[in-house]
Amino acid sequence: MAKVRAAVVGSGFGGLALAIRLQAAGCRTMLFEKRDQAGGRAYVYRDQGFTFDAGPTVITAPDCLRELFTLAGRSMDDYIELLPVNPFYRLFWEDGYRFDYSADQALIERQIEKKSQADVAGYRQFLKYSEEVFREGYEKLAHVPFLNWSSMVSVAPQLIRLKAYRSVYSMVAKHVRDPHLRQLFSFHSLLVGGNPFTTTSIYTLIHCLER
């Protein structure tokens, strides 16, 4: 029997991951990329001696990368050293306000309290919501193959309960009133190319995921 052959178009993270999985499953795989190097959103631009990262800013789920190396019979530690960064990033506004975004819950709350004491309680409620969305939308559903309409309909009750029909910004604004803080906790959908004002609130799970 002839060996199964597969072609993957695009060598971003998704394309690379798929190609590795196909190859590990015994498929003879060919990867096509129109640019001069692989990476997709992780592309690097060089100009006049400067290097610019197109993204990503942080690796939010390193276990997914580790799994790919394991499938290929390799150890990620032999190739990559992941270093913790604190803060994850520092956000600046035109009026001079800035915020250090990190996994340190106490630091996050101190900065919120300094900016808008009334929003601390609302932020904690938002964090609980983000954690619930993470459990339901990522841990339970992220690896489910929705191959037909009925499989998608089956999860509709959970999505409705989590108010997935609301936007990221709308859900953040429900809990937090300060304009800077609303922007702070709703910009994460930009990391995956989404508009916070139109992207489903399911993407608030990123706040929990990257921590």
What residue ranges belong to the model's regions?
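N-terminal glycine-rich phosphate/pyrophosphate-binding loop and immediately adjacent elements
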Residues: 3-132
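Generic alpha-helical structural context detector
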Residues: 70, 186, 204-207
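Residues forming anionic-ligand binding surfaces in small-molecule and nucleic-acid pockets
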Residues: 199-211
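Short, intrinsically disordered/low-complexity patches at protein termini
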Residues: 76-77, 101, 146-147, 205-208
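A short, structure-level motif marking secondary-structure boundaries and short turns
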Residues: 2-4, 50-52, 152-155, 211
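Rossmann-like flavin
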Residues: 94-200
